[in-house]
Amino acid sequence: MAKNKGLGRGLSSLLGEEVISIESEIIQIINIDKIRPNENQPRKNFEYDKIKELADSILNNGLLQPIIVDNNFQIIAGERRWRACKLAKVLEIPVIIKNLDARESMEIALIENIQRTDLTVMEEARGFKYLVENFNYTTEKLAERLGKSRSHIANLLRLNNLPQSIQDKVNENILSMGQARCLINHEHAEVMADHIISNDLNVRQTEELVRQWYKNEYTKSPNNNNKVGKRFLKDNATDNDLESLVKVLSEKFGIKVTIENYSLGGKLIFHYKNLEELDLILLKLN
């Protein structure tokens, strides 16, 4: 049988042609409750609609492709199918048991999942990081094993250096990979990210924003009206005024109020303890 090019060279080279053709493998029927997912697999989010669609297909046609597990029944390949079978309330499923130790099983499971096309950028980046840190992979070795370019792997590995809040924005498609790359190791990455999102900047504008920051053009003139040139840092000159305003607002609303001020904007935060306090705030605002 012809090899499926979508798998790349990694999984097929590790597991052999059994990944593509299972004719020579012994398929066993196992109670689904004995099977467990791999906790180290990079995919963290499974879309319910897609799992439900697969579950409906399994109910109508059965599970056409066995799940691959290790000696401890930990999934190496096929977690989506396993989840769909659970959803469809299938009691027993076909599996192929691979004679692998825990380390080999984990490595192959990671590679199999990373090679999928529907991982998010951050899921792929975290998978690369795990392989580098736990299996001594280099960028070159990963590129060869996964059939990806070294630059792609290097760029994604660097995304792991971003603050968690920005990684989450990338994962949720609020920020693109190109925008996020501009903020790696930036002192005020989170503030910059908020500005990029609120002003709907594209990648080129984001690159220019960061370039201007590092050129320190934002300090040349206190009256600089260029959006790219404005300061992001807190304006200490207004601290006294803000403290007075915080005091007035706290007394007026009877709760803790804080203000985070930046030259490009800021946040006015009301800290309420329960819904009754929230209702009072809304009543006074109206």
Swiss-Prot record:
Can you supply one Gene Ontology CC term for this chain's record?
chromosome
Query: What InterPro entries does this protein's entry cite?
Result: Chromosome_partition/occlusion (IPR050336), HTH_ParB/Spo0J (IPR041468), ParB/RepB/Spo0J (IPR004437), ParB/Sulfiredoxin_dom (IPR003115), ParB/Sulfiredoxin_sf (IPR036086), ParB_dimer_C (IPR057240)
User: Example GO molecular function term?
Assistant: DNA binding
List the keywords (alphabetical).
Answer: Chromosome partition, DNA-binding
A Pfam family: ParBc
Q: Is DNA-binding among this UniProt entry's keywords? A: yes
Keyword Glycosyltransferase listed? The answer is no
UniProt cross-references to Gene3D superfamilies, sorted A to Z: 1.10.10.2830, 3.90.1530.30
Checking CDD domains in the record gives:
SPO0J_N (cd16393)
Q: Which GO biological process annotations does it have?
A: chromosome segregation; positive regulation of sporulation resulting in formation of a cellular spore
Top-rank taxon of the source lineage equals Bacteria
Primary role? Involved in chromosome partition. Localize to both poles of the predivisional cell following completion of DNA replication. Binds to the DNA origin of replication.
Query: Which family is annotated?
Result: Belongs to the ParB family.
Q: State what protein this is by name.
A: Probable chromosome-partitioning protein ParB
Gene symbol of the encoding locus: parB
